[in-house]
């Protein structure tokens, strides 16, 4: 099954728009992950993702934990990220969710050569190669996938 993977921070969740996000993370405060605003119309995104699942695509998350971390903080960040997904994409039944150590190559979760990645980080897109896109391309690319599947 071809997977459509999403990064969270800076891609669908505006972590970097939260006031004082970096000092908070350095103090092991997971609040910015929970408080991040959405970066696109989530009801539209959810509709596209659900339609794509019905035509055979898998939907997944690959998101990094905080750069500075402890086991307890990693657990709190994971809970905050899962809570954010549940709040903003409640109707999406994700096939896979990987919340992993900061810097883990996202390519290690690629399942097929056709897998797609949406990520704001240039290095991740470069490592992924073809079928990697910026956050502002999400809706247009999902529309194209649906059109091609029909």
Predicted stretch roles:
Residues 3-4, 116:
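Structural motif
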Residues 5, 9-84, 88:
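Alpha-helical substrate-recognition element adjacent to the catalytic core
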Residues 54-56, 86-96, 130-135:
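Structural alpha-beta junctions
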Residues 58-60, 98, 116:
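A structural signal for isolated positions on well-ordered beta-strands in alpha/beta enzyme cores
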Residues 62, 99-102, 135-136:
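Conserved beta-strand termini and adjacent loop/short-helix elements that scaffold enzyme active sites
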Residues 76-79, 92-99:
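Lumenal/extracellular "mature" regions of secretory-pathway glycan-modifying transferases
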Residues 95-114:
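Donor nucleotide-activated moiety binding/catalytic core segment of transferases
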Residues 112-150:
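Acidic, Mg2+-coordinating phosphoryl-transfer loop and its flanking beta/alpha structural elements
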């Amino acid at each position: 099954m071809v997977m459509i993977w999403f990064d969270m921070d800076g891609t669908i969740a505006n972590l970097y728009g939260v006031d004082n996000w970096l000092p908070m993370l350095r103090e092991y405060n997971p609040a910015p992950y929970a408080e991040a605003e959405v970066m696109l119309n989530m009801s539209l995104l959810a509709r596209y993702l659900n339609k794509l699942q019905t035509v055979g695509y898998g939907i997944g998350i690959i998101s990094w934990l905080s750069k500075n971390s402890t086991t307890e903080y990693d657990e709190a960040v994971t809970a905050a990220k899962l809570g954010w997904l549940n709040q903003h994409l409640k109707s999406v039944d994700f096939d896979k969710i990987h919340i992993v150590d900061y810097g883990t190559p996202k390519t290690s979760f690629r399942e097929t050569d056709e897998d797609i990645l949406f990520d704001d980080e240039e290095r991740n897109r470069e490592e992924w190669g073809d079928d990697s896109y910026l956050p502002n391309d999400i809706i247009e690319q999902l529309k194209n996938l649906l059109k091609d599947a029909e």
